[in-house]
Amino acid sequence: MAEKAENLPSSSAEASEEPSPQTGPNVNQKPSILVLGMAGSGKTTFVQRLTAFLHARKTPPYVINLDPAVSKVPYPVNVDIRDTVKYKEVMKEFGMGPNGAIMTCLNLMCTRFDKVIELINKRSSDFSVCLLDTPGQIEAFTWSASGSIITDSLASSHPTVVMYIVDSARATNPTTFMSNMLYACSILYRTKLPFIVVFNKADIVKPTFALKWMQDFERFDEALEDARSSYMNDLSRSLSLVLDEFYCGLKTVCVSSATGEGFEDVMTAIDESVEAYKKEYVPMYEKVLAEKKLLDEEERKKRDEETLKGKAVHDLNKVANPDEFLESELNSKIDRIHLGGVDEENEEDAELERS
């Protein structure tokens, strides 16, 4: 049965038993895998096959479904967004369409995602990896505030890897292939997390063509010559040259979610990506955190200075005549230090002759 984020204990007594929160990511914790991809690329089937593969190895995963619109999840799920937010009720209540309702559900789930992180941390010793299946409409997750919050929350807590699923059958079209690679590049530079491109449906079309296109520009150029649209050819050719550097450091895996082919390679790529997270992402995260702390300190000092200046101006404007205000302040100080006994002459002074 799926766990609900709301059901996580949060009493002070239970919280006191837990270790104090860490200042940075726990690099020794099991990794989380964010599964992204275009609609129809086979994300859910991929998660199903990977879940079965891990169970067969006696290393079960912790599975989270973040797609509120799916009618049936074909794998055992530990946390299900549908238990927290009702997709159809959101559409009905707010008068939204499918995409708007998905984004609203993610926004609502996002408000409780700290509890999901706590569940992941609590169960970490019981699973090998945490798999997160995202909505079919990729833009609803990757380009929304809630998607960024979920991704950043995971990445700042423990090792996190992004898997981008590509439909190999559709990618045989050079233009579609380039669209997928451009989208993958944008997600990589947006998240800055270790990134794996998974060419799915290898049982239908062997994705070796895609690997050759990524390694050799001339092969991709030859494939473009067979296409009809000259405008798209020129654009794809230009983009291919631009993305050449992107291809160099990109991990790629070819799999078939239908037959189970290539999933050993998936696990190897995950292990390599976790090491990349430790060596590349964590130092970058700590640097950004230190810079933010420094900026916050500078902003605090500026606010304090502005507050003091504002108070001085306010005190000066309390009277219509500043000179009278200063004179009254001076008299007030004199009164505070006046010891008395000099307002009247004493007897000896009175007997002195005055010229």
UniProtKB/Swiss-Prot annotation:
<feature type="site" description="Stabilizes the phosphate intermediate; shared with dimeric partner">
    <location>
        <position position="99"/>
    </location>
</feature>
<dbReference type="InterPro" id="IPR030230">
    <property type="entry name" value="Gpn1/Npa3/XAB1"/>
</dbReference>
<keyword id="KW-0342">GTP-binding</keyword>
<feature type="coiled-coil region">
    <location>
        <begin position="286"/>
        <end position="311"/>
    </location>
</feature>
<dbReference type="GO" id="GO:0003924">
    <property type="term" value="F:GTPase activity"/>
</dbReference>
<feature type="region of interest" description="Disordered">
    <location>
        <begin position="1"/>
        <end position="30"/>
    </location>
</feature>
<feature type="binding site">
    <location>
        <begin position="40"/>
        <end position="45"/>
    </location>
    <ligand>
        <name>GTP</name>
    </ligand>
</feature>
<feature type="short sequence motif" description="Gly-Pro-Asn (GPN)-loop; involved in dimer interface">
    <location>
        <begin position="97"/>
        <end position="99"/>
    </location>
</feature>
<keyword id="KW-0547">Nucleotide-binding</keyword>
<keyword id="KW-0378">Hydrolase</keyword>
<dbReference type="GO" id="GO:0005737">
    <property type="term" value="C:cytoplasm"/>
</dbReference>
<keyword id="KW-0539">Nucleus</keyword>
<feature type="binding site">
    <location>
        <begin position="200"/>
        <end position="203"/>
    </location>
    <ligand>
        <name>GTP</name>
    </ligand>
</feature>
<protein>
    <recommendedName>
        <fullName>GPN-loop GTPase 1</fullName>
        <ecNumber>3.6.5.-</ecNumber>
    </recommendedName>
</protein>
<comment type="function">
    <text>Small GTPase required for proper nuclear import of RNA polymerase II (RNAPII). May act at an RNAP assembly step prior to nuclear import.</text>
</comment>
<dbReference type="InterPro" id="IPR004130">
    <property type="entry name" value="Gpn"/>
</dbReference>
<comment type="subunit">
    <text>Heterodimer with GPN3. Binds to RNA polymerase II (RNAPII).</text>
</comment>
<comment type="similarity">
    <text>Belongs to the GPN-loop GTPase family.</text>
</comment>
<dbReference type="InterPro" id="IPR027417">
    <property type="entry name" value="P-loop_NTPase"/>
</dbReference>
<keyword id="KW-0963">Cytoplasm</keyword>
<dbReference type="GO" id="GO:0005634">
    <property type="term" value="C:nucleus"/>
</dbReference>
<feature type="compositionally biased region" description="Low complexity">
    <location>
        <begin position="9"/>
        <end position="21"/>
    </location>
</feature>
<dbReference type="GO" id="GO:0005525">
    <property type="term" value="F:GTP binding"/>
</dbReference>
<dbReference type="Pfam" id="PF03029">
    <property type="entry name" value="ATP_bind_1"/>
</dbReference>
<keyword id="KW-0175">Coiled coil</keyword>
